[in-house]
Amino acid sequence: MLPGRHTPRRADAAAAAAAMEPLVPGATRAALSEFVATAVFVFAAEGSVYGLWKMYRDTGTLGGLLVVAVAHALALAAAVAVSRNASGGHVNPAVTFGVLVGRRISFARAALYWAAQLLGAVLAVLLLRLASGGMRPMGFTLGHRIHERHALLLEVVMTFGLVYTVYATAVDRRSGGGDIAPLAIGLVAGANILAGGPFDGAAMNPARAFGPALVGWNWRHHWVYWLGPLIGAGMAGALYEFVMAEQPEPPAAADTRLPVAAEDY
């Protein structure tokens, strides 16, 4: 028998198994974890903006920026902490995309995560609108004299930093178990909001922008909050995975087995 004779058959079997992955109970539980964690994060994050507007009719002050940054940092840290064991604690389609670029997750599972994250964000904003007596969500908008190209660059840079932090503290096996990951991820998100909030709101998360946009039906500049984070996340995932991460030693003998699906971290 020639080596590799049945490789196409194995490849077909692996592809079929990967396509069925969303139906596996573990994948379903992971997606549910992402749904709940994203809803928790977006409810607290967007809720902090609701609260400021309810009390002061203004969210553009230094104090307001600090409140929103702290709320996002704490909510994201908590959301990552409660979901990391079940799903890896992505809570963000951009993070999932960065992990996909690094080949740490299969496309089938990534698609399942994206759907769960977007639905969780929409549910959170719907609940906020109901609980607030019909207040429209604030959502994201560009600051005075800020062009879309400026906001796009900001989102690329800020999301790059966020996803790079995810890789360094949660994905990399050298991080010592990733116990610091939720705090580090929350802190970098809060710091980025302090830096970029006055310019474009500092979303760094397509789901965070999508929920308010859908519920409030305001799509102006919305593409910026998808394209920027996805570019930044892809760059961070590629850089860390293929340059910064410790590469495994080559096996003594070639292993022709094909995995069913990429392992999530």
Swiss-Prot record:
Residue ranges of the motif NPA 1: 92-94
Biological process (GO), any one: water transport
Subcellular location: Vacuole membrane
Keywords of the record: Membrane, Repeat, Transmembrane, Transmembrane helix, Transport, Vacuole
UniProt topology in membrane: Multi-pass membrane protein
Reported tissue expression: Expressed in leaves and at lower levels in roots.
Domain of life, per lineage: Eukaryota
GO cellular component assignments: plant-type vacuole membrane
PROSITE patterns in UniProt: MIP
UniProt GO molecular function: water channel activity
Regions that span the bilayer: 32-52, 62-82, 110-130, 151-171, 179-199, 223-243
Chain positions of motif NPA 2: 205-207
Keyword Transport: yes
Keyword Hydrolase recorded: no
Family annotation (SUPFAM superfamilies): Aquaporin-like (SSF81338)
Function (record text): Aquaporins facilitate the transport of water and small neutral solutes across cell membranes. May be involved in transport from the vacuolar compartment to the cytoplasm.
UniProt family annotation: Belongs to the MIP/aquaporin (TC 1.A.8) family. TIP (TC 1.A.8.10) subfamily.
Domain notes: Aquaporins contain two tandem repeats each containing three membrane-spanning domains and a pore-forming loop with the signature motif Asn-Pro-Ala (NPA).
Annotated protein name in UniProt: Probable aquaporin TIP3-2
UniProt source species: Oryza sativa subsp. japonica (Rice)
